[in-house]
């Protein structure tokens, strides 16, 4: 009996601790980039879906942007097509783009929507092509040439890899106002109707800016931002983050995520959060508890 009472008291403590956060964020929009291990582990997938439904239930407006790199890679391998990566991005020819679009919009997006709906939510799946949500343009990368005597960098054609040119929030606004949960695959459309594969972190950041979101949440496969000793950095302002970039603490795969977060907070998003998607209920723990579990970035304290 004592264990049961203790357990009940713990639940009550969690609920009362969450109350001021629920009140603070009611009516606010939270953009979540969903990816990494959280998308491939069944328990984590269900945990994430329940978190999103709970957010909507208490008056928060979640908007989900998802990736799907591992799923794309598996299908490309099955059809015998090799993937080439440059600066961490997949070179995407026409055939690869067709597969990317098939996987993201036809498989991954529908699975997320189905899980959210199974847990009592009302999710609607979109790509950036729906309602001209994501206007895209071709992304060109540059790299130093092999010949050191040539100072002009080489321009790399990445095929159907794009960047966000403009966000048209109308369809998302309509869905949110109608109590639906938008789930968006990061495929944009160009001026000529071409499809472009866009990094999901970048789409999430730009969408958070365009929606005037309260928060941008990026789920990753790390605990958050770590210092050089491997200790979690829980709260930072933009100036501190820039210093960590300058001294090399933030580098490699984390750098694009952090730059995306910085751009969002500079553009008016109240805060950006780097969370460990491998932790069950990571989103709810960050939003509704005093301690949180990841790294919070604000423009200023």
From Swiss-Prot:
Keyword Flavoprotein: no
E.C. no: 2.7.2.8
Pathway of action: Amino-acid biosynthesis; L-arginine biosynthesis; N(2)-acetyl-L-ornithine from L-glutamate: step 2/4
Compartments (UniProt record): Cytoplasm
Keywords associated with the record: Amino-acid biosynthesis, Arginine biosynthesis, ATP-binding, Cytoplasm, Kinase, Nucleotide-binding, Transferase
Record protein name field: Acetylglutamate kinase
Site feature Transition state stabilizer, where: 33, 257
Role description: Catalyzes the ATP-dependent phosphorylation of N-acetyl-L-glutamate.
Any one cellular-component term (Gene Ontology): cytoplasm
UniProt record similarity statement: Belongs to the acetylglutamate kinase family. ArgB subfamily.
Any one Gene Ontology BP term: L-arginine biosynthetic process
CDD domains in the record: AAK_NAGK-C
Residues binding substrate, per UniProt: 68-69, 90, 197
Organism of origin: Nitrosococcus oceani (strain ATCC 19707 / BCRC 17464 / JCM 30415 / NCIMB 11848 / C-107)
InterPro entries given in the database record: AceGlu_kinase-like_sf, AcgluKinase_fam, ArgB, Asp/Glu/Uridylate_kinase, Glu/AcGlu_kinase, NAGK-C
Enzyme class: transferase
Pfam families, per database record: AA_kinase
Main location: cytoplasm
Gene3D superfamilies hit by this protein: Acetylglutamate kinase-like
MF terms in GO: acetylglutamate kinase activity; ATP binding
Reaction(s) this enzyme catalyzes, per UniProt: N-acetyl-L-glutamate + ATP = N-acetyl-L-glutamyl 5-phosphate + ADP
């Amino acid at each position: 009996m004592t264990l049961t009472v203790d357990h009940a008291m713990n639940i009550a403590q969690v609920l009362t601790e969450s109350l001021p956060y629920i009140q603070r964020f009611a009516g606010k929009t939270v953009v979540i980039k969903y990816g990494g291990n959280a998308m491939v582990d069944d328990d984590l997938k269900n945990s994430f879906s329940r978190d999103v439904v709970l957010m909507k239930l208490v008056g928060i407006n979640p908007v989900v942007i998802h990736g799907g790199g591992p799923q794309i890679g598996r299908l490309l391998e099955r059809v015998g097509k090799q993937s080439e990566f440059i600066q961490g991005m997949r070179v995407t020819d026409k055939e690869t783009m067709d597969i990317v679009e098939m996987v993201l919009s036809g498989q991954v997006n529908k699975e997320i929507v189905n899980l959210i709906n199974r847990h009592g939510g009302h999710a609607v799946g979109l790509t950036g092509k729906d309602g001209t949500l994501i206007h895209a343009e071709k992304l060109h990368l540059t790299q130093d040439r092999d010949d050191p005597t040539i100072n002009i960098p080489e321009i790399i054609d990445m095929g159907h890899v794009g960047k966000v040119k403009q966000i048209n929030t109308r369809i998302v606004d309509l869905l949110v106002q109608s109590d639906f949960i938008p789930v968006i695959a990061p495929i944009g459309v160009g001026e000529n109707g071409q499809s472009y594969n866009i990094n999901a972190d970048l789409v999430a950041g730009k969408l958070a800016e365009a929606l005037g979101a309260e928060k941008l949440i990026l789920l990753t496969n790390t605990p958050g931002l770590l210092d050089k000793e491997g200790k979690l950095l829980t709260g930072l302002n933009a100036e501190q983050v820039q210093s960590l970039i300058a001294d090399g603490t933030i580098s490699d795969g984390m750098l694009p995520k952090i730059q995306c977060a910085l751009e969002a907070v500079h553009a008016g998003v109240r805060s950006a959060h780097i969370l460990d998607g491998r932790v069950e209920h990571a989103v709810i723990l960050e939003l509704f508890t005093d301690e949180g579990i990841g790294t919070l970035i604000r423009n200023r304290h």
